[in-house]
């Protein structure tokens, strides 16, 4: 058994518009499921919540104020996780999220 940590940055998981890259997320989840089936552990560390939130909130530019960034992140996080959860569930893998802050 091996343990993998996969870091996916915003530019990997989302277009500049904030739209999620379904093809990339699908391939990642396919690989996670294959490794899970072999008994490996996989942790996905993902960015993209702000980008997704910006699209949902129809923000034309990335916010600069911390409060606006937090709002976009809060809106986008659940929607981003839902995509991972659905893709992994379709492949027989249970997912969970852990939210970290600067102090973690």
Which positions does each model-derived feature cover?
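Nucleotide/pyrophosphate-binding catalytic subdomain
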Residues: 1-104
């Amino acid at each position: 058994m091996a343990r993998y940590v996969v870091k996916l940055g915003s530019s990997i998981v989302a277009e500049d518009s904030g739209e999620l890259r379904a093809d990339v997320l699908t391939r990642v989840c396919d690989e996670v499921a294959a490794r899970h089936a072999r008994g490996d552990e996989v942790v996905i560390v993902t960015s993209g919540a702000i980008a997704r939130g910006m699209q949902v909130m129809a923000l034309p530019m990335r916010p600069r104020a911390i409060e606006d960034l937090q709002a976009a992140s809060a809106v986008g996080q659940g929607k981003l996780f839902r995509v991972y959860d659905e893709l992994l569930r379709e492949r027989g893998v249970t997912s969970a999220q852990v939210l970290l802050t600067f102090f973690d």
